[in-house]
Amino acid sequence: SSSAASDVYKRQSEFWGHFEDDCRDSEKSEAEKNPLFYNIFRHTFSNQWDNTWKVNEKEREGYGKKVSFWVHMNNTDDDLFLLERSLGVPLAVNMQGSATENQEAIALNKALPVLVAKGSDDLNVGREASIFECFTQLSSGDFSITDDKGRYYKLDASNMPFAIAENPATNTVSKAGIYWVALDFNAMTYKMREIEKVELWNKPWFGHDVPDTAEMTYQGQGEWSISDYAWVVSHEDGRKDTRYYFICTYVDGFKERWGYYSDDCRGPQNSNPGNYPNFYNIYRFDHSKLEEWDDSWKTLNDSEGVGKKATFHIYMNNTYAADYKHTRSFK
């Protein structure tokens, strides 16, 4: 009867799922995924595992996190029905507002971890897959955090989590200063650590008992420099020696050594730095875990800069290069 047919129609269910029977692109980056990955397709029920989405299990995406889903069954947001989930690590993150440098957008970089042991010639340190960071100056005011998908993030200063905001959201800077800012998209927590100073450390291995430190000047965009510094090269029994690295001191007392990738700047690298692409790279170490001379650079053949003034420039951003770098020159 027409009534029975109507009841069957009312009871009939469908599920809204992935376009493939199995989610084969789940471990690919967002840029590499099939363009239809998040599109919603309407299916009649057959097998409970068919046409399901997966997270990136290889990267433990979303493990220990809470997830939000948005289902867009309209053509307002896209030509096709869409699924949006909040646990994916974004491809790009920016900060912008009245509190940021020149009120311009500040791009956060994939974070470089802070190491707790000295380096080695074969040191291989990659960027954190789910943590974004920047070194920047913030003024008293507001700023927003957005990602490549146009999502806004709201920081909770009480216990340091953050979350996707349902509407455009701003965050407040209570104290102007130079900061290291890091957002962990796996734990959904963040850190803001104020930087007290960045110094050049210069002390040869021998013949110079007292280390020389000189405060560097913040230049903006995560860069520091020092110019016309009287360079120290020791002389003893016909030998010469030079050593340097950089010390970042935070207001809370924690110190990072921004240093060379290996525990010692040995002959081949010291003699031909141009042959080693990571020679001028800056690596981050817990300063308290290292001996005094660990992970220090030397100048060319321990002789460069004798009787000259030195200029150093630090780039703790990915604008100058893909890695954190420094440059040096003598005149």
What are these language model-derived features?
Residues 139-140, 175:
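Surface-exposed loops/turns
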Residues 1, 78-81, 132, 143, ...:
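Hydrophobic residues embedded in beta-strands of well-ordered beta-sheets
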Residues 15, 19-91, 134, 149-197, ...:
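Intrinsically disordered, low-complexity polar regions and short flexible loop motifs
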Residues 3, 69-71, 143-145, 243-248:
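Short, aromatic- and glycine-rich surface loops/edge beta-strands on solvent-exposed regions
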Residues 10-41, 88-139, 149-161, 195-240, ...:
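Aromatic- and glycine-rich beta-strand/loop motifs that create alpha-glucan
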Residues 176, 216, 246-248:
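Short low-polarity hydrophobic stretches
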Residues 2-12:
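Short, small-residue-biased leader/transition segments that mark boundaries at the very start
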Residues 141-142, 241-243, 307-310:
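Glycine-centered loop/turn motifs
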